[in-house]
Amino acid sequence: MCSSDLAPCGVRSLSRWHRDHPYEMDAGGQHFSVGYLPADSDSGMFGGNSNWRGPVWTPVNLLIVRALLQFHLYYGDDWKIECPTGSGRLMNLFEVAREIGARVASPFLRDAAGRRAVYGGAEKFQTDPHWRDLILFYEYFHGDNGAGIGASHQTGWSGTVAKLIQLFAYLTPEAALRAHDMRPMMSTYGA
């Protein structure tokens, strides 16, 4: 997993590498450029709702985790990759899946200062005792800082972070290699 693809809160929808290396083309006498944007679109290109150029989407990360677990069943513990790229850390695919799962869950957890990344600069949700523990499941997340963006009641897909937490709380790498141990848990989140 390239470090420019991996955000603090999961895998970005478009690599941060494209911030400095946008995709560019000329068509119909016009110049088009698509680069990394960690949050909402900065132009009307593609209708203006181009929030696929950098934010983190929970359902995509869930599919990546599922695929990594499936490949881990085939390759086992001995097949390792560097994650993130350039870190020098070698991980098997189960460990990479668990790393992504932990990153997806991280915006909802309090940091050392008691703040949740999901709430960004929304002080009412960060500090008010009546609101600070009411977790909102946003549509997607800022690709650089994990702040929730878009609709704030997307429990249909961002709420699936609970399944990732549950999965990695109970599933061990050893159990993952015994496919029959994993199937009941995998089936509960769409496998």
PLM region spans:
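Acidic, mature catalytic/reactive cores of soluble proteins
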Residues: M1-A191
